[in-house]
Amino acid sequence: ATLLFKSMRNLIYIITKLFFFVNGELENSTSPGILWTPSQEEGGSGDNQNHISRTWIKDLKTISDFVKDKYGYDPGSYDKFDDFESKNWKLMARLDWNINKSHKLSLRFNTVKSENDASISSTSSVITKANSNRYGVDAFAFGNSNYGFRNIVTSLSGELNSNFSSSVQNKLLVTYTHIRDSRTTKGDAFPMVDIYKDGKQYMTLGTELFTPFNDVENNVFSVTDNVTINKGNHLITAGATFERQYFMNSYLRAPYGYYRYASMDDFMTGEKTMLYGII
C-alpha cells in the first residue's frame, strides 16, 4: 500500500508538470479523372459528345504488348481508369513542461502532407506542340503517362521561458520549417513517345515530360534569444537572432527523352522520328 501511494503521488506530480495535446486528421477523396475512353469500333471512331477517342483499343493493346516485350516497360492501363485521388494527412502535437517555478518549456510539432493525381500535359512537347490534346477525340494516353503532385510542410518549434529573478527574464525560441513541393510519376522511367496517325496525335506512352526531377525544397532554421531587464521605469531588452535558409529548385524537361513518330509502324520498326529531344 505504501508503494502504491508513492507511485500515484509521483504520477500526479508529473501530470501537473506536463501537459500534452495530439491531433491527427486524414482526408481522402476521389473525383473523375480521365473521362475519355478508347474506341471499341473496328479501326477506331471518335465521338466527341460521348468522350470516345478515335484511338482503337486494339491499337493500344498492340503498342502495350510491344513495349512490354521489347523494352520491359509497362505503359499502364488504357481502359477502365481509376478515379483520381486526393489525400491529405495532418498531425499536430504540443507539449508544455513546467520544469520548475523559474523555467517553462513548450514544444510544438505540425506536419501537413497532400498528394493529388493529375493527367498528362495536353499538348506540350520539347519543341513544337502536339496538334491535339493527348486525351481527346483524336488521341489517347496510357495510364502511366499521368502524374501526381506531392506537398509537404513540417514545422518544429521550442520555446523556453526563464525567470532568473523578479527583474530578469529570458526567452529562447528555436524553430525549424521544411517545405517541399514535388511531383510523382506513374510506373518506371521511360522516354515519352507520341504516335501520330493521319497527321494527327493518336496515342502517348512513357513518363510525363515535366515531372521527373521537378522538385522545390525550402528549409529554414532559426534561433532567437531575448533577455528582458526591468529597471523600475525602464524596460531593457537585448537579444540575438541566427537564421539559416536552404533553397533548392530542380527542373529538367524531358529528362528521359522525347520521341514523336508518324505512325505505329514507324515506332515499332524503328523508323526515323518526326521529332525528338534528349538531354
Task: List where the protein language model places each region.
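Transmembrane beta-barrel wall of Gram-negative outer-membrane proteins
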Residues: A1-D117, G148-N170, V174-Y176
